Amino acid sequence: MTVGDTTSGSGEEPAADSSVHATPHHEVDHTVEPTDDPLAIRLEALILGADRRYTPFQAARTAGVSMDLASRFWRAMAFADIGQAKALTEADVLALRRLAGLVEAGLLSEPMAIQVARSTGQTTARLAEWQIDSFLEGLTEPPEPGMTRTEVTYPLVELLLPELQEFLVYVWRRQLAAATGRVVQAADDEEMVDRRPRVRFADLVGFTRLTRRLEEEELGELVESFETTAADLVAPTAAGLVKTLGDEVLFAADDAGTAAEIALRLIEAMSQDETMPALRVGIAFGTVTTRMGDVFGTTVNLASRLTSIAPKDAVLVDGAFAKELVRHGEAPESEAQAAEAVAAAAERVRLAEKEGREPDDEPPLPTYRFGLQPMWQRPVRGLGVVEPWLLARRGKTGS
């Protein structure tokens, strides 16, 4: 017997009742007219693929899910509280069945199912808001005089909906495959024992002042250009763009060289655009806590602090990240050490020529992509004394 089921063991149906709790799910009244704008209801039905049919209680009961669990799922997905209005469809029932079924089958714990609902709801809510705003942005004037915004929106959604739905599923599958591949590769790679991510913040300088000076459209274009540039630089690498916050982006990678390269390329790309303000980047190395696609912890806080104290158009890194670059041969411990390595290589070549051997037989000259310059030590609230390093790109090999 499902939650709210009022039938007895005799199989007789209960008497009709005005209470929604007494309405069996197979006797849903389809004659009740919604009080909302009929055209808006048509648009909603187009998007949802079905007409309004169930109250929340009826949907939960039809799905065989307790009202308490259904409510928690809906709250997690950030659905509006509609009371017991008849506003849900067959798709809502099916979604409840599927999510609850994963819990019953032991594939997900109940807290994990709630988390899945919340992360999916938050991600798609932002995507939906962005898409509808973008599609309707240019429709300030109706195609024909007297047309309402709903009348303008309906044919546009009718054309776009099936294509966008297929595209969304395609992109999600590609991203899922990429994320799964990274996890599997990390588990199989014996050398990658330490999976502490390198976390980077990139922050536009003087963004608050810009918000007062620029028009809304100009500000939007600037933010979009910044986010697009960051995403384009991160996408081809093994790094991941965690989130964008207007004037700030957060991305993470497991390889120190990749992290440093992205940071410097971002500085270089932004400095070539005269319309963009200066950029500051902070990188920290350490463990992080991941939750619903976001990252938290001391490493993230340190990267953020380094960004706030970095010079304009510069990259500051913490000591742990600097050691990683040195350990992997991406940067010398110091410029003096790099000069000694070059001098030693030159001496090996000289001795080889003196002995009649080919210099190519000698060990190659050290190749350093990056240079590190120690900066001033300073106390950072909650993190103690921090000694940042200024990251820069070195010139030609061995220089």
UniProtKB/Swiss-Prot annotation:
Gene3D superfamilies: Nucleotide cyclase. Residues 1-10 have a biased composition (Polar residues). PROSITE patterns: GUANYLATE_CYCLASE_2. GO terms for biological process: cAMP biosynthetic process; intracellular signal transduction. Mg(2+) binds at D203, D247. SUPFAM superfamilies: Nucleotide cyclase (SSF55073). Its EC number is 4.6.1.1. One of its GO terms (molecular function) is adenylate cyclase activity. The keyword Translocase does not apply. Residues 198-307 form the Guanylate cyclase domain. Keywords: ATP-binding, cAMP biosynthesis, Lyase, Magnesium, Metal-binding, Nucleotide-binding. It catalyses: ATP = 3',5'-cyclic AMP + diphosphate. Pfam families: Guanylate_cyc. It is an enzyme of class 4 (lyase). Residues 1-35 are annotated as: Disordered. The keyword Nucleotide-binding applies. Binds 1 Mg(2+) ion per subunit. Its cofactor is Mg(2+). Belongs to the adenylyl cyclase class-3 family. This is Adenylate cyclase.
